[in-house]
Design a protein with these regions (language model features):
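N-terminal membrane topogenic signal
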Residues: 17-39
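Alpha-helical transmembrane segments of multi-pass inner-membrane proteins
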Residues: 146-173, 192-194, 200-249, 253-262
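Membrane-interface helix-loop-helix junctions at transmembrane boundaries of multi-pass membrane enzymes
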Residues: 27-32, 73-90, 222-236
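Membrane-embedded alpha-helical segments of multi-pass membrane proteins
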Residues: 56-75, 118-129, 208-216, 254-262
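Interfacial loop-to-transmembrane-helix boundary motif in multi-pass membrane proteins
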Residues: 32-35, 88-93, 131-176
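Structural signal for the C-terminal ends of transmembrane alpha-helices
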Residues: 48, 69-81, 130-142, 219-227, ...
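Juxtamembrane membrane-water interface segments that cap and precede transmembrane helices
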Residues: 43-51, 184-201
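N-terminal hydrophobic segments of proteins, predominantly signal-anchor/transmembrane helices
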Residues: 35-50, 65-130
């Protein structure tokens, strides 16, 4: 870890202990480049991947990749460094296109599907590129982004509770609102995928497992040796989210799948 990273981490630790959260956030913003706001927005919108506000992709409509792309474009010089450092990762779209050519020659190419597949791969690259720039090159202090991430997932859980209450108390204005907000809605009776299921802000209820075990759980393991406070906060979030999802009958099969015998 270079001296800049150590300095930023020391500042962030000072902000974390004994200061009001809003002052820590303002101090963080004043010590970073303006482009960091795109990174923070991308992190904040990670749990929002199924609304009509996002970019359409097969089976989901995320917002964060576009925000991470804006962050990468604002830091294009650092993006070149990250691309050179992680060249195999950035050659992934080229490799996928080459591997797809035999199938296109034999069965034909569907331009719309090919376009969405390529943009999906680019979304992966800008997300990983944003992380590489922020953590590996700019050495942005990690506590503030992590606080935002935890808060955004708690917010999405709260949205799920509101959806559950709206469904079970038959609050039609709320169910209609969420039905219009979600790209593939599972909320009300007009859903072609079956109504009466909350989905938080995810594309579908089964995505709960992806977020819990693909985003939050790895972060918790990374935090165990770095900051016990944040590891505990992430653990509490995962436990409450998983138990809450099961009790509200959303994504139960996905949450419990690892513990269920094959039928």
């Amino acid at each position: 870890m270079n001296q800049a990273c150590v300095h930023n981490d020391t500042i962030d630790a000072g902000n974390h202990h004994g200061r009001p959260q809003y002052r820590s956030f303002l101090r963080f913003l004043t010590t970073q480049e303006r482009s960091v706001i795109w990174l923070l927005l991308g992190i904040a919108f990670l749990p929002v991947d199924g609304t009509t506000l996002g970019l359409y992709a097969p089976f989901w409509s995320p917002i964060s990749p576009a925000l991470f792309a804006a962050y990468c474009l604002c830091n294009w010089r650092q993006l070149r460094i990250a691309a050179n450092r992680y060249l195999p990762m950035f050659l992934l779209p080229v490799a996928c296109i080459i591997l797809s050519i035999p199938g296109w020659l034999k069965f034909g190419i569907h331009l719309n599907a090919a376009f969405m597949s390529i943009t999906g791969l680019l979304g992966v690259l800008v997300t990983l590129g944003a992380i590489a720039i922020a953590v590996g090159i700019q050495c942005i202090p990690w506590r503030t982004p992590l606080r935002i991430l935890i808060a955004s997932y708690w917010f999405s859980f709260g949205v799920g509770v509101v959806q559950w209450l709206a469904i079970h108390l038959h609050i039609k204005p709320l169910t209609d609102y969420f039905a219009h907000l979600m790209y593939r809605q599972y909320i009300n009776e007009s859903s072609v995928w079956g109504g009466g299921h909350l989905q938080f802000l995810f594309a579908e209820p089964s995505y709960i497992g992806m977020h819990l075990f693909g985003v939050l759980l790895p972060l918790m393991w990374l935090m165990r040796g770095r900051d016990r406070i944040y590891a505990k906060r992430l653990r509490n979030l995962i436990v409450v989210y998983a138990i809450g999802a099961v009790l509200m009958q959303a994504g139960t099969r996905i949450v419990l799948r690892a513990n269920l015998p094959e039928s």
